[in-house]
Amino acid sequence: ARWVSHVELQKRQLLRAKENHRLNGLAVDDRNFVREDLYKHLRRAAKRDVEVDGIILDPPPMVPKRGAHLPPGQDYSTLVPLCAPRLAVGGWLLCFFHRRERTREEYEAEVVGASPVPLELLWQGTSGLDFPDDPQAKLRIAAFTRTG
């Protein structure tokens, strides 16, 4: 990638991302760390017809400003229609599933079903040894690719 943007509403998390870049020997350019509501950022990207090679979605279990836990899921039904069209054909979407109310398969079906562009499951993963042994309690990760 020629550039990466990290969009985060919480200042503390954005500072943590910058520090992680430093710790990994990566250049830190403040223009790549955007403190903004992701929903607004994605809507603006759509207006500018921005196209990207990859997106990492790691939404919190509780969405700021809405003040309440969402129905089962992490608001992928709203986020995916905003971000999937921004992917170039062949681009990837990496999703982190934190909440336990649903299975991995249900989350993956939600992502594919919410997308206005064709997505296919590319890869699945889980968290490491520092998470519980129960597969449903682990952090579940899935990568999708835009096929058309």
Language model features with spans:
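A short linear-motif detector with a strong N-terminal bias
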Residues: R12-L15, G73, E120-Q124
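A generic structural signal for alpha->beta connector loops
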Residues: A1, D30, G90, P116-P118
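Surface-exposed loop/turn and secondary-structure junction residues enriched for glycine/proline
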Residues: D29, K65, P132-D134
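C-terminal catalytic and target-recognition region of SAM-dependent MTase-like enzymes
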Residues: W92-G148
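Glycine-rich loops and low-complexity Gly/Arg-rich segments
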Residues: D29-N32, L57-P59, L79-L82, P118-L121
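S-adenosyl-L-methionine
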Residues: Q10-D53
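S-adenosylmethionine
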Residues: D37-G113
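Conserved SAM-binding motif I beta-strand of class I
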Residues: W3-E8
